[in-house]
Structure formats: structure tokens, C-alpha cells
């Protein structure tokens, strides 16, 4: 399944606030479509599916990528759901977003894809790169790269910098000090339901 490139606000109306996908809030609080306002009891499967879709759309990953993250989280020690969120949050595109260099994760992914971001002084153009504690994330020392990020910073996506990151606005340099803690994850999600959704699939 490919990455979603359609209308973002339509997804937000269906799934609720997705800070990584869009800064816009829908004017209508019900899902889009002819029967958007109809109320019917949802099945447990539908509820789990919706939580899974929140993760997929918020972080901009494909179904295949999400399945691989679930499998990797299962192999790790501790809570599978917590580890799954950590793997998604520590992606380079999401880290660039959380540092405030881009207003959304798709915008951050574009910065990474186009070679505007460095990790420990070397250009890394892989959005899924897993950032580790101690690594320095910076803007490439080129005028075009700096202009793009400075323009993005005029319209930040999230107000607060997570506790595991630090960022110097003058040098456009950030540092990963630790793995993110659960309380700093901006997306409202029940990760246990996502793990349950994949229990028979992944």
C-alpha cells in the first residue's frame, strides 16, 4: 500500500487531530461524506483499524513499513506498543518535525529527501533513519537549505520541544539526548489497540 497523497483535511475529519499530517483543524467534527453525521455502533475491529490508521497517516508510513515496525517492536524488550511509538517517533523525518524545522512530517520528509539535513555532519536523505541518543541533527550548510528551514520555522507545527531533544535556533542545530518518553508523544493514540489489530496480521 502506497503513501497517502490525497486531501489531508478529509483524513483529519475522519480520524481526529493528526499533528504530524496537518496543522489545520476541521470545521466539521464529523467524518466526510453523505453519511458522515450518521451515528452507528462501531465494531471492535473498526475501532482497532481506526487507531492503526491514525498511526499510519500521522507518521506518513506505508502499511508495509508499519508492519515491519510492529515486528521489530515485538522483538524488543518491554511494552510492544511503547516500542512501536518510539520507533516511529525516532525516525529522522519525525525528529526534524519535532525540532521545529518543518510544520508537518511530510514537509520534514521533503527536507530529508532533498538532502537539506545532516546527521553528525553527514547528509542523510533517508526519512526512516533511526535517530539515536547523542546524534546531532542540523541543517546543511548551504544558503538554500537554511532559507527553507528558516521559512518553515515561522509556522511551527507543535509549540513545545520534547524533553529528549534540544535545538539552537541560531545555528539551526539540534541534538538527540535520549529516546522520547511516552508523555511527549503529541498524537492521541491507544497503541495497545494497534498491537491488537496486528496480532493476527503481522
From Swiss-Prot:
Q: Name one GO cellular component term.
A: small ribosomal subunit
**Do you know which SUPFAM superfamilies this protein is assigned to?**
Alpha-L RNA-binding motif (SSF55174)
Q: Where is this region: Disordered?
A: 16-42
Which stretches make up the S4 RNA-binding domain?
90-151
- Tell me a GO biological process for this protein: translation
- GO molecular-function term, one example from the UniProt record: rRNA binding
State how it assembles: Part of the 30S ribosomal subunit. Contacts protein S5. The interaction surface between S4 and S5 is involved in control of translational fidelity.
Which family would the database say this protein is a member of? Belongs to the universal ribosomal protein uS4 family.
State the function annotated in the UniProt record: One of the primary rRNA binding proteins, it binds directly to 16S rRNA where it nucleates assembly of the body of the 30S subunit.
* Name the record gives this protein: Small ribosomal subunit protein uS4
Source organism per entry reads: Rippkaea orientalis (strain PCC 8801 / RF-1)
Amino acid at each position: 500500500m502506497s503513501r497517502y497523497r490525497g486531501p489531508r483535511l478529509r483524513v483529519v475529519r475522519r480520524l481526529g487531530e493528526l499533528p504530524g499530517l496537518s496543522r489545520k483543524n476541521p470545521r466539521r467534527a464529523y467524518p466526510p461524506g453523505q453519511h458522515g453525521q450518521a451515528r452507528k455502533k462501531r465494531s471492535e475491529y473498526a475501532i482497532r483499524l481506526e487507531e492503526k490508521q491514525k498511526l499510519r497517516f500521522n507518521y506518513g508510513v506505508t502499511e508495509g513499513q508499519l508492519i515491519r515496525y510492529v515486528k521489530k517492536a515485538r522483538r524488543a524488550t518491554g511494552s510492544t506498543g511503547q516500542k512501536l511509538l518510539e520507533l516511529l517517533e525516532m525516525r529522522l523525518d519525525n525528529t526534524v518535525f519535532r525540532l521545529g524545522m518543518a510544520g508537518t512530517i511530510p514537509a520534514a520528509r521533503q527536507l530529508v529527501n532533498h538532502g537539506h539535513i545532516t546527521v553528525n555532519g553527514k547528509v542523510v536523505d533517508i526519512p526512516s533513519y533511526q535517530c539515536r541518543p547523542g546524534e546531532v541533527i542540523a541543517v546543511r550548510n548551504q544558503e538554500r537549505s537554511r532559507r527553507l528551514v528558516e521559512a518553515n520555522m515561522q509556522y511551527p507545527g507543535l509549540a513545545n520541544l520534547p524533553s529528549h531533544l534540544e535545538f539552537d535556533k541560531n545555528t539551526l542545530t539540534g541534538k538527540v539526548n535520549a529516546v522520547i518518553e511516552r508523555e511527549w508523544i503529541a498524537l492521541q493514540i491507544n497503541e495497545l489497540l494497534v498491537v491488537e489489530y496486528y496480532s493476527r496480521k503481522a
